[in-house]
Amino acid sequence: LASKLVPPRPAPRLYLATPPVDEPAQLAAELAGLLAAADVAAVLVRLRETDPRGMISYVKALAPAIQTAGAALLIDGQPDIVARAGADGAHLTGVAAMEDAMPALKPDRIVGAGGLATRHDSMAAGEAGADYVLFGEPDAKGQRPSTEAIAERLEWWDELFEPPCVGFATSREEAEAFAAAGADFVLVGDFIWSDPRGAKAALVEIGEAIAQAHAGTFGKAKVEGKAEG
């Protein structure tokens, strides 16, 4: 019997959504500190709808703080400005919007998909080339599935499909549940920025919490063996 020790899968990383951008210089300074303190894989920049030139200037003001920290900069929607703004990709809501954005973004930039209400939608997004799928964000009416339903969807996707899955967490408890369910990334946003202790303390705590929750489920190395001959 030949056996090998398979290392535990890596813990999910943080995906940080910004507040709607009003003061990019102030936000850039804050982001620099946040990204130095916590392991953030990507930042989702949420822009207030304005003219393209204005939105591009906002993204360019934020880009150095994000990209020099080694994080990817994705824009929430607005695929047409991604290349000109120097962003790394875009997050699109719905399969149709994602497919429409593909020509402007592929093959050089990241295309994320959310707004996937059904398993069929999720599979369609994956087949259409999504670089990740997001589960759990609020719909247009502000409603979202239960924590248990989101965790179940993450677990289902993780077991069957290759593209990374992201869990949209609105609390520490959700972040922990999604890490334990097999999320590759945990998206956090408003509850980080509104934390009375400050965003940095909140983000560091969430990073530690998802690492611990992940370790509790996936943290032990496994021995795989097969009979020879």
Language model: regions and residue ranges:
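Alpha-helical protein-protein interaction elements
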Residues: 7-9, 149, 185
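Glycine-rich phosphate-binding active-site loops on the catalytic face of alpha/beta enzymes
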Residues: 94-101, 134-145, 181-206
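Generic structural marker for isolated residues within well-ordered, non-membrane alpha-helices
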Residues: 31, 98, 154
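Conserved N-terminal beta1-alpha1 strand-loop-helix module at the mouth
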Residues: 1-91, 106-131, 162-165, 170-176, ...
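Extended, folded domain segments that form the structural surfaces/walls around functional sites
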Residues: 53, 135, 151-155, 175-180, ...
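Ligand-binding grooves and catalytic loops that recognize ribose/phosphate and carbohydrate rings
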Residues: 117, 124-128, 132-135, 148-157
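CoA-thioester-processing core
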Residues: 101, 141-143, 147-160
